[in-house]
Swiss-Prot record:
One of its GO terms (biological process) is protein transport. Residues 142-208 form a coiled coil. It comes from Gibberella zeae (strain ATCC MYA-4620 / CBS 123657 / FGSC 9075 / NRRL 31084 / PH-1) (Wheat head blight fungus). Residues 74-84 have a biased composition (Polar residues). Keywords: Coiled coil, Cytoplasmic vesicle, Exocytosis, Protein transport, Transport. This is Exocyst complex component EXO84. Belongs to the EXO84 family. Component of the exocyst complex.
Length: 679
């Protein structure tokens, strides 16, 4: 064991352990330099020991310092060009301006902080607008540490925010309504302009087609005159003036009736009906074999196509004119132009030359029920065929144009009726006025020197409705007076006058009802009462204003007397009743004199007398249990008459009416008690 204790893994000799001295008290900083230097003579030893000792410089040399110097002194050559090696370019980073940081969102959703222990929580408007807001959690987080006063302040702030939001919503609704009305007017105006543009484009297309056809056919001969009917007008007759056009058309139809037997049965006389072309002689062909069947003659009218057969006149017939022509025309078929289709048969291919030659100058008339007839000109390559086809197309186009115009006029009239009726359902009850709306849709009225149509009246009605809805009564009354003045000035336009009066009167009733309700609520304020009565008088509802005001004052008397409670002192109770009655009557008469015209004062006096009579009934009922002309009875009567003297200040003397016929009042005497079957 002793040998093992002598064995050690450390190499070399063991050094002697350092000796640690006991701690010493340091009275000053340790000197960094010259610590063993003795103090100067005459110097304070404490100052000498307080001087700092400089730190010795680091030792130079060493392996580590050489490596560090060599590392920092190494140079690296910069490459001339750095290649990306074909890597794609760096994608563009998205902008973070559109994204809100999480801290901001969290802070926005947190309940509002409180500035102090005595201040109510501030309402976070942005947090309230959050669609995912949960009210229970929001209130719990905001008012978790709030006091009763802070909760009340927070509730009042919420009410203010609610009121402000309601006001903003109402203003937004009215602004949207105004913009909607304005946009509707612009859309209606644009619709009318587009309709006019469509009509102009249609007319331009028709005129352009006619000009091209006329230019293409200018070198062809014009259609011949009616050979058999000499009265039918020729091309020279068509050059007559427009004033004689109706007479010319009438003479054409008379000549047609005379020249074509039975034509009046198919073509009765109508306004504007005239002959467009006498196409001359034609031959009717068989539909299957294309063989000739009989001789025909075609007449084209502006709205019909007449086919007449040519027959020989019998010379030995009774009443026959020997000097007349040998051939006569008999009406065979007649179709409206819009019900038939005229097809050129020259475009149909035929195998045989004879068939092709026959159909080269033929047309097919396809009528109602797919019934078709083929007609060929007598003369080969007769220009009447091309002219007939051209005139048929032009006549059909004119008819369709007329139908479109008529349909658009009817639609416009129907739109006008629907427009006015939809805006005012009460107009449907005015059948006479509703039937004339299509006639007055384009009527112009003079307003302040300018011509306006009835749509302007509708715009004024819209503004009036807005004023009534917003309770701008002064503006509404002024607008009503303006419209009534315009209606009175339309002496030559009875229909427009009735229309405006109907619209204005309907709004007047609604406006008067609203002002009447306000009058009943504010009858105790003389200024507001005078203003409301003035509005109703200007609207022509002074009777309604008078009745509403007096009814409201009667209700006030009834309510005030119900507040008087009898507590055993009859004299005090009669004093309160008489004071309420005569003071309210005094104030009512005084306000009535300042608000209503003098001719209506009789109604107010009658109302005051009725109220005094009602007071006498109550007085007689209360004094019926007292001794007649006793002390209590006398005191109550004197007090009532003293209060009745208030009416003398407004020009009424009802003192003699107080207690009148009081002794006539007899209370109902109750009989003796009646038992069960015993009297």
């Amino acid at each position: 064991m002793e040998d093992r204790n002598k064995i050690s893994l450390r190499s070399g000799r063991r050094k002697k352990r350092p000796t640690i001295s006991a701690p010493r008290q340091i009275s000053g900083p340790i000197a960094q330099d010259d610590s063993n230097r003795p103090p100067l003579p005459g110097a304070d030893p404490s100052q000498a020991s307080a001087q700092p000792r400089p730190r010795p410089p680091p030792m130079a040399g060493g392996k580590t310092s050489d490596l560090v110097k060599r590392r920092y002194s190494t140079r690296f050559n910069q490459p001339s060009s750095i290649s990306n090696g074909g890597a794609p370019p760096m994608p563009q980073m998205p902008s973070l301006a559109n994204y809100e940081p999480r801290e901001t969102v969290a802070a926005a959703r947190k309940p509002p902080s409180r500035s102090g222990p005595g201040v109510a929580p501030v309402i976070d408007i942005k947090g309230l607008r959050d669609p995912k807001l949960k009210p229970d959690r929001y209130v719990q987080a905001a008012l978790s540490d709030a006091t009763e006063d802070q909760i009340r302040e927070f509730e009042e702030s919420l009410r203010q925010v609610k009121t402000r939001v309601g006001t903003d919503l109402q203003q937004s609704v009215m602004q949207n309504r105004t913009q909607f009305i304005k946009i509707s007017k612009e859309a209606e105006k644009l619709k009318s302009e587009m309709r006019n543009l469509k009509n102009f484009m249609s007319e331009l297309k028709v005129n352009t087609t006619a000009m091209r056809a006329a230019a293409a056919k200018s070198d062809e001969p014009m259609p011949s005159d009616l050979g058999v009917a000499p009265g039918i007008s020729s091309r020279r007759d068509r050059r007559t003036s427009i004033a004689d056009r109706s007479a010319m058309w009438n003479s054409q139809m008379q000549a047609l009736y005379k020249g074509v037997e039975g034509s009046q049965k198919f073509l009765p006389n109508a306004v504007g009906r005239h002959v467009v072309q006498d196409a001359g002689p034609w031959i009717e062909l068989d539909n299957a074999t294309y063989k000739s069947r009989r001789a025909m003659q075609i007449f084209l009218l502006n709205d019909h196509l007449l086919i007449a057969s040519r027959k020989k006149r019998k010379a030995d017939a009774p009443g026959a004119d020997a000097r007349g022509p040998m051939m006569k025309l008999v009406a065979d078929r007649c179709w409206p132009l819009l019900d038939v289709e005229v097809v050129d048969m020259s475009s149909t291919g035929e195998s045989s030359n004879s068939g092709r030659n026959k159909l080269a100058d033929a047309i097919m008339v396809r009528g109602v029920g797919q019934e078709s007839f083929i007609y060929r000109t007598e003369k080969p390559q007769d220009p009447e065929k091309k002219q007939l086809l051209l005139n048929v197309r032009k006549a059909i186009e004119q008819l369709r144009k007329g139908l479109r115009s008529e349909m658009e006029a009817n639609n416009k009239a129907r739109e006008t009726i629907n427009y006015f009726a939809s805006r005012d359902p009460g107009l449907l009850q005015k059948t006479e006025l509703l039937a004339t709306l299509s006639d007055i849709k384009d009527m112009l009225i003079e307003v302040d020197g300018k011509q306006q149509n009835l749509r302007w009246v509708e715009s004024e009605m819209d503004d009036l409705d807005i004023d009534v809805a917003m309770q701008r009564f002064e503006d509404a009354v002024v607008r009503v007076e303006k419209l009534k003045a315009i209606a009175r000035g339309l002496k030559n336009h009875a229909i427009a006058q009735d229309f405006i009066n109907f619209k204005v009167n309907e709004r007047c009733v609604r406006l008067a009802n609203m002002i009447g309700r306000e009058l009943e609520m504010t009858h105790d304020n003389n200024t507001k009462t005078r203003r409301n009565v003035s509005w109703l008088t200007r609207l022509g509802f002074e009777d309604s204003a008078r009745e509403s005001y007096l009814a409201a004052r009667s209700g006030t008397i009834h309510k005030r007397t119900r507040q008087c409670i009898f507590q055993g002192d009859l004299h005090l109770y009669i004093w309160e009743l008489s004071f309420v009655y005569f003071m309210v009557i005094h104030n009512t008469v005084q306000c009535f004199q300042s608000c209503f015209p003098p001719p209506m004062m009789s109604v107010c006096v009658k109302w005051a007398k009725e109220e005094v009579d009602a007071f006498n009934i109550i007085l007689a009922r209360q004094l019926s249990s007292t001794e007649l002309r006793g002390q209590v009875w006398t005191q109550c009567m004197e007090r009532a008459k003293e209060h009745s003297k208030l009416l003398s200040e407004v020009g009424l003397d009802f003192e003699n009416l107080v207690g009148k016929n009081l002794m006539i009042y007899e209370p109902i005497d109750q009989g003796p008690s009646v038992g069960l079957g015993l009297s």
